[in-house]
Regions:
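Extracellular loop and loop/strand-boundary signature of outer-membrane beta-barrel proteins
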Residues: 22-24, 57-61, 74, 136-142, ...
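Short secondary-structure subsegments characteristic of cysteine-rich extracellular domains
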Residues: 66-78
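Acidic/polar loop-and-plug regions of large Gram-negative outer-membrane beta-barrel proteins
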Residues: 7, 14-16, 97-150, 193-202
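Residues embedded in well-ordered regular secondary structure
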Residues: 1-62, 101-102
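Small-side-chain secondary-structure face that scaffolds active or pore-lining regions
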Residues: 60-68, 90-92, 98-103, 147-148, ...
Length: 203
């Protein structure tokens, strides 16, 4: 419980006592969109199924988002009596930017009396950092690109002399990779005592 004296001190010293809520600096909502398409068909010799999808997600603060593409294809082919070939292809590609759980955690960890930005517009130094650097997309970015692909082929043969028995040959190839890119640029944060005094004009 704050006394009237404390409240007056907070109001009259905005560079010393904050009245902050980091959640106010975040966007009110994020969103995601999903698009998908699938096609299937065939005949008694060949059957196929192909699908693809795209997802876009926007986060709650500057520059945070994700784009993801995924695809799947399946082919079943009758070659000769008792011999079939199945081919499966799956994969996805993702592009994530500035994804971080610590920024949201910071929204709840800082005291509302902590000054985040001085009246001069400069960012306050909180042990050399400031959560608004991430919220406003300052200081650089982190981007993560992933690519996962799998191809699987199965050749199955039903033994004509042993009803219900079959043998198969299966091969699988995986191609997975990930690229992380980090870009940093220096940003200035200040403590209250280091804010330069406004220049005064000579009388």
């Amino acid at each position: 419980v704050y006394e009237k004296y404390d409240l007056n001190a907070i109001k009259s010293n905005p560079n010393l006592y904050g009245n902050e809520n980091l959640l106010d600096y975040l966007d009110k909502f994020g969103f995601s969109t999903l698009h998908s398409l699938s096609v299937s068909g065939g005949n008694k010799f060949v059957k196929y199924y192909v699908s693809g999808g795209y997802t876009h997600m926007k986060g709650l603060y500057s520059g945070v988002g994700r784009d993801r593409f995924n695809y799947s294809a399946k082919l079943d082919a009758y070659i000769v009596k008792g011999l079939t070939l199945s081919l499966d292809i799956t994969g996805n590609r993702s592009n994530n930017k500035n994804t971080s759980y610590t920024t949201i955690d910071a929204a709840y960890s800082y005291s509302p009396l902590q000054v985040l930005r001085f009246t001069t517009g400069e960012l306050a130094s909180l042990s050399g950092s400031n959560p608004l650097l991430a919220v406003e997309g300052l200081g650089g970015y982190i981007r993560n690109k992933t690519n996962f692909n799998t191809i699987s082929a199965t050749l199955n043969y039903e033994l004509p002399f042993l009803k219900g028995m079959s043998i198969y040959l299966k091969a699988t190839v995986d191609n997975n990779n990930s690229i992380n890119t980090t870009f940093s640029s220096p940003e200035t944060t200040r403590t209250f005592s280091t804010i330069p005094a406004p220049e005064t004009l000579p009388a």
